[in-house]
């Protein structure tokens, strides 16, 4: 019949379930590699040579190492503040880790939403407003818990504890906004949003956190 002829004529091939699963696995592997700052590879781990593993990792590691020098520059620029209140140094790792974790959570959520079609680039204002409100709640919770720890367990003076906790709130807010912003920008520029994942977000957030920390310390502690 004419309908059968049309069906036969339009049929150009068959995609099996195995082919579909293989494609999904390849896409997932590529995204995981990008989200961990590695070049993607279509080969299984044990079938990649040492040279291939090196090529997939070294360029990103070099880029992130160079990027992290900005954090060192910030610390050197505020050596006077650290010298005046040396206890500030002890809380730098906690602040940068909190910022990196908050930014990574936001980025992962946005990237997944974009992957399943739940989020579009034109949703950016709504994304930022939503992330801002969530960040206030998360940052406030962390700051309250941390303030109690600093006062009652660490024996830190209230002014220094206030500096650390205010920085913590600001860091979480900035980190989640950055984490929500970068994947959308990447999508608009036709880059893979997965590139804007944990390692890159952490590098950006580290520098931002240090700038906020030392400036709040200078204002509140008069140093």
Located regions from the model:
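Cytosolic regulatory modules rich in charged/polar residues
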Residues: 2-92
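Alpha-helical transmembrane segments of multi-pass membrane proteins
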Residues: 55-60, 125-138, 201
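Alpha-helical transmembrane segments in multi-pass membrane proteins
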Residues: 63-68, 91, 95, 99, ...
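Transmembrane helix-loop junctions at the membrane interface of multipass transporters and ion channels
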Residues: 77-81, 150-157, 182-189, 214-223
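Membrane-water interface of transmembrane alpha-helices in multipass transporters/channels
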Residues: 77-92, 154-166, 194, 223
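Nucleotide-binding motor/catalytic cores of P-loop/tubulin-like NTPases across gene-expression machines
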Residues: 82-87, 174-184, 194-195, 213
């Amino acid at each position: 019949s004419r309908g059968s002829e049309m069906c036969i004529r339009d049929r150009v091939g068959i995609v099996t379930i195995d082919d579909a699963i293989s494609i999904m696995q390849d896409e997932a592997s590529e995204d995981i590699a990008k989200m961990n700052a590695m070049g993607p590879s279509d080969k299984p781990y044990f079938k990649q040579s040492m040279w291939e593993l090196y090529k997939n990792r070294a360029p990103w590691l070099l880029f992130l190492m160079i990027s992290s020098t900005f954090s060192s520059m910030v610390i050197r620029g505020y050596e006077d503040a650290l010298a005046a209140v040396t206890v500030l140094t002890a809380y730098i790792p906690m602040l940068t880790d909190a910022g990196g974790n908050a930014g990574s959570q936001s980025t992962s959520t946005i990237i997944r939403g974009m992957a399943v079609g739940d989020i579009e680039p034109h949703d950016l204002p709504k994304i930022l407003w939503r992330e801002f409100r969530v960040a206030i709640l998360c940052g406030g919770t962390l700051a309250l818990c941390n303030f109690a720890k600093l006062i009652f367990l660490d024996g830190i003076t209230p002014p220094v504890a206030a500096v650390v906790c205010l920085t913590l709130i600001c860091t979480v807010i900035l980190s989640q906004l950055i984490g929500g912003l970068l994947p959308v920008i990447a999508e608009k520029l036709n880059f893979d949003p997965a590139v804007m994942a944990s390692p890159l977000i952490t590098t950006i957030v580290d520098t931002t956190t240090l700038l906020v920390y030392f400036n709040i310390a200078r204002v509140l502690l008069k140093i």
